[in-house]
Amino acid sequence: AARFAQTAQYNYTRMLDRGDTLTAGMMLWEGIKEAMKLQHYIEGRYPLHDKWLLRSMQESEAGQRAAELLQEIGAGGAAQETAMAVEKLAGFFSGELYREGFISDTDSYLDAHSEELIFKASMGAKSRDALAEEIAKLEFEAFDKVKNEGGRASCQNDWGTFSIMRKSQYLTWNRGMLQQYLYDFYREYHRGHNLIEEKYGRMMESTAPEKYEEIKSHFPELTAEKKAIIEQIVGLQVGWMEEFSCRYPSLAGNARYIHTYEDTAEDTSYETYLRGELGTYSDKMLELYGRYIVEYAQNGKNPAYDTMENSVKMYGYDSVEDAEQKIAQWEAE
């Protein structure tokens, strides 16, 4: 993507502006070759020898569309028309890269996505367990820096519990979600934006509304559309948590209250926590999370159960049912 951007997108017009038509032509044809290779990479295929690139591209529907756009670039039209054709192809690629989960937005200048592409490529060989572990460690580092009005919270020193709670959730996610969230969190953290701090701040809209009014300007504003999506997701997950609570009351009794109306200044409900967390997600991450929730709904499964299953196994139980039975016995003694 960066090579296509540096040759056809950037240096082609730059060389033309200098009056160097020979180098401009070289940049354009280099860019065409890089575009053919990029289409192969997007499809998860290794590009063949240069002489077979075009034919190989045309084996897929997306490749055929890219080839048509490349034909426009190579048609030998006026420089302005060629530059417009290059931008049209760049827009096509940004859409394909976004759709496949490689990038978080559709900025058509492809070099703008280099950092994200390199970061996600470096995560490619890691297992889901390793990705979940890396996210939890980065979050705990960020959590350590959160300043509480009442002083440092004891849970900020409890890596064991924090690790289990976070990984239990992340191990229900797919690789695309894990890579996206890890990239988002890493990027924001190294820009000085602590998503854990933002999450707890957003929760205060319910638990400490007066304080929230003082701090809300520090958080990115959520669009009406994003708020609506979050509320749809929250509604589904609260329903699933209610269902889980009915079936496994002993386990649920050791977790958070479920509903926002149960919030106090000291206790934050599952609903409020979830709403705060989703409010920190990037547009791309929320899109992926929404698909994940839809998939659960379509399959008639419950993410609350799967998350709790991961959690109790990390605590040494065989299953949710085993944990429920043993905890109920202890409570009865």
What is each stretch, according to the model?
Residues A1-A125:
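Conserved nucleotidyltransferase catalytic core and NTase-mimicking acidic/glycine-rich helix/loop elements
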Residues R18-K37, H49-W52, G239-Y248, E271, ...:
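A contiguous, surface-oriented mixed alpha/beta subdomain in the mid-to-C-terminal portion of proteins
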Residues Q64-Q80, E115-G124, T268, Y273-A323:
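Long amphipathic all-alpha helical oligomerization modules
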Residues S127-N157, S168-L171, R187-H190, G201-E205, ...:
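Basic helix-extension-helix modules of the SAP/HeH family
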Residues E149-W173, Q179-D184, L195-E197, E262, ...:
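A cross-kingdom feature marking solvent-exposed beta-strand/loop segments within repeated
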Residues Y170-Y186, I229-L236, L278-Y281, M285-V294:
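Short, structured motif recognition centered on aromatic/hydrophobic residues
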Residues L178, Y183-T223, I293-A323, I327:
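Repeat-associated, polar segments at repeat-unit boundaries in modular proteins
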Residues S206-D283:
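Short, solvent-exposed interaction modules
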